[in-house]
C-alpha cells in the first residue's frame, strides 16, 4: 500500500527468463503481456490518479526503466532509467460511449493486450476508463511479463493504493537519475569485462568439475543415480501430461474474455467441505466447466493437459522479474464427482511439486535466451504441451482505494502463449474472480462456454451446503443475451 517504504533493490540485469519474455513482445503469438482490470465504484480524481503513478515510478525504478540490449551479445541486457521517461505516455484515460458495462471494458482490454508495448520505453501502461454505468470507472493496468509475473506485480504496484478513500497527502519521492546507455555502449562494456568473465567462468567450471569428480569417486552410485533421476524428472516435467482436446487444437489471433465473481468465504467453505484448498476447488470448477462444454458439443474427454504456474518467490524477494515454474496436470475433466475431482487434482499437484527438475525451464533459459529468434519460436511452438493454463494470484485481503475510488473487483487477464485458454483466479477484498481468456478458434461458442463456466463453479459452491451460494456472472447474463455486470450492481 501507499504506506510502505522504498521497495527492495531490483537487479539491473535481465534474467534469462525475463529476456525470453522480452523477445516475445515482437511476435503476436508469443506476446506475454499481463493485465489487471480493476472495477471502481466511481471515477478517480485524475490529478491524484497521475500523482499515484508518478510517485510509484520514483519508488519502484522498474517503472521508469527500459531494456537496453547490446548490439552483440557480449553482456546481459540491462534495465536502465529512461532519460526520455514521460508519464503521459504510460498513464492515459479514455471515455467509452456509454453507459458501458464490464463487457465493453473487457473488449477494450483485448485491443490493448494485442497491441505491442513500445520496447524503447518502460514496458507498462495504465488506462483509466470513464463513462461506465452508474458513474463507475475501470483501470486497465498492462505490464509486460518481462517486467514481472503476477505475484510480483501485486507487490510492485502496491504503492498506488490507499487503505482509506481520502488519506492525507504524502511527500513526493526524489526523481531517479536517468541513464544514457546505448546498445553499443553496453556491447563495449561487455567486451571490456570479457577477460574477467572468461577467467571467472573457467574457474567456476573447473571448481564444479573437481567437486563433481570428488563426489563421483567417493559416492559413485549415488552420483550416477542422482543424475539419472534428475534426467527422468526432467522428461516427466517437460512431457505433455495428457492427450490434447480435439476441440481446443486450433489457434488464431482472435481472443475473448469472460469473467465470474464468487464470494471468497463461499469458495473457502466449499473447498473445505470437499477436503481441499481454494486452489483445488478452483481447478475442479474449471475442469467441471470444460467437461460440460465438451459434452455439450458431443466430444466427451476424460483428461486434457493443463499447466498451473507455481510461485517460487521467497519472503523478501524483490518484486521484479519472473520467479515461477509450471506444473503440468492431466486435468480430470471427465471425473463427474466434484469431490473426487478435487482429490485427483490435489494428488497430482503434490506429486508434481516434488519433482527434482520442476524448475528445468529456468535452468535451460540461459541457453534458450541467446538462440536466434526463428529457432527460438520454433522450439517454443513445439514444446507447448498444454491446452489450458490456470493461475491463482492472491492480492489484498481488505478494502483498497485508488485516488478516492474504491476497488470493487479485480480481474486478471493473462497471455495466451500457445495455449487455447488462460484462466486467472484473483482474490481481493473478500471476493474471488475467475477470468477466462480464450482463443476463439478453439472456443467457438461464446454463449455456451459462459453457461458452462457458471455451471461448473456452481457445482463446486453447492458443496458448501444449503442454501447453496451461486456464481455471479460478471461479463454476461444468465440467458447469454446481454452483458449486464450484475455481480457488482449492489456492491
From Swiss-Prot:
Induction details: Constitutively expressed at a low level, it is not further induced by hypoxia or nitric oxide exposure.
Record-linked SUPFAM superfamilies: CoA-dependent acyltransferases
GO biological process: biological process involved in interaction with host; glycerol metabolic process; response to hypoxia; response to nitric oxide; triglyceride biosynthetic process
EC number from the UniProt entry: 2.3.1.20
Record's signal peptide: none
Pathway recorded for this protein: Glycerolipid metabolism; triacylglycerol biosynthesis
Catalytic activity: an acyl-CoA + a 1,2-diacyl-sn-glycerol = a triacyl-sn-glycerol + CoA
Record-annotated active site: 145 (proton acceptor)
Enzyme class: transferase
Keyword Iron-sulfur belongs to the record: no
Keyword Transferase tagged: yes
A Gene Ontology molecular function term of the record: diacylglycerol O-acyltransferase activity
CC terms in the record's Gene Ontology section: plasma membrane
Keywords: Acyltransferase, Glycerol metabolism, Lipid biosynthesis, Lipid metabolism, Transferase
InterPro entries: Acyl_transf_WS/DGAT, CAT-like_dom_sf, O-acyltransferase_WSD1-like, O-acyltransferase_WSD1_C, O-acyltransferase_WSD1_N
Sequence similarity: Belongs to the long-chain O-acyltransferase family.
Function: Upon expression in E.coli functions very weakly as a triacylglycerol synthase, making triacylglycerol (TG) from diolein and long-chain fatty acyl-CoA. Has no wax synthase activity.
Protein name: Putative diacyglycerol O-acyltransferase Rv2484c
Source organism of the structure: Mycobacterium tuberculosis (strain ATCC 25618 / H37Rv)
